[in-house]
C-alpha cells in the first residue's frame, strides 16, 4: 500500500510540474543596452528580440549587396533581422519584399516589425528602399550615408518618399 501511495504521489508531482506555463527569460541588461543604443523605451509588451537584434546592427556601414555586420544594404538588413527574429526568409530586393513578401498596410496602422517602403522620387511606384518599423514612428534601415540607423517617418525626406507599409 505504501508503494502504491508513493507511486501516486510521484505521478502527481510529475503531472502537475509539467502543467506550469513557461515565461520567456530575457536578459534585462541586454534590453537596457538596446534601449540606450536605440534611444527608445522598450516595454514589456514589445518584441524584445526585435529591439535587441536592431541594436546589434546599429552603426554597421552601408554596402550595396551586403548582408553581414561588415556591411549591409537596406534589403539585406531587413532580411537578416527577419531571419533571426521571426525565422522568416525575405526576398533580397526592396521591391520584391514589397510585392512578394507583404500585404499592404496603411501608415496609420503600422505595427512593430512591419516593413516600410520608400521610392527614390524617380519611380514612384517602385520600392527602392526598405526599413523595419519599430514604434513611435521610428524605423531602422541601412542609409547609404550613415549606415544602419534609426529614422523617423515624420522627417520631410521620408514623408516625401513614402510608398507603403507591408506586413510579412
Which positions does each model-derived feature cover?
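Aromatic- and glycine-rich peptidoglycan recognition patches
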Residues: 20-42, 46, 104-106, 126-128, ...
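Gly/Pro-biased beta-strand-loop elements
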Residues: 50-60, 84-90, 162, 167-168
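Catalytic cysteine-centered active-site loop
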Residues: 37-38, 60-112
Amino acid at each position: 500500500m505504501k508503494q502504491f501511495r508513493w507511486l501516486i504521489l510521484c505521478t502527481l508531482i510529475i503531472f502537475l510540474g509539467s502543467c506550469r506555463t513557461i515565461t520567456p527569460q530575457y536578459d534585462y541588461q541586454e534590453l537596457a543596452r538596446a534601449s540606450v543604443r536605440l534611444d527608445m523605451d522598450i516595454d514589456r509588451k514589445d518584441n524584445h528580440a526585435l529591439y535587441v537584434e536592431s541594436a546589434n546592427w546599429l552603426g554597421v556601414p552601408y554596402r550595396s549587396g551586403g548582408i553581414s555586420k561588415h556591411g549591409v544594404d537596406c534589403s539585406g538588413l531587413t532580411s537578416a533581422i527577419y531571419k533571426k527574429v521571426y525565422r522568416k526568409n525575405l526576398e533580397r530586393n526592396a521591391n520584391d519584399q514589397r510585392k512578394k513578401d507583404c500585404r499592404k498596410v496603411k501608415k496609420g496602422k503600422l505595427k512593430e516589425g512591419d516593413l516600410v517602403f520608400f521610392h527614390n522620387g524617380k519611380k514612384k511606384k517602385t520600392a527602392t528602399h526598405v526599413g523595419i518599423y519599430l514604434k513611435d514612428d521610428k524605423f531602422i534601415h541601412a542609409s547609404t550615408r550613415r549606415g544602419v540607423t534609426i529614422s523617423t517617418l515624420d522627417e520631410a525626406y521620408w514623408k516625401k518618399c513614402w510608398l507603403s507599409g507591408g506586413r510579412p
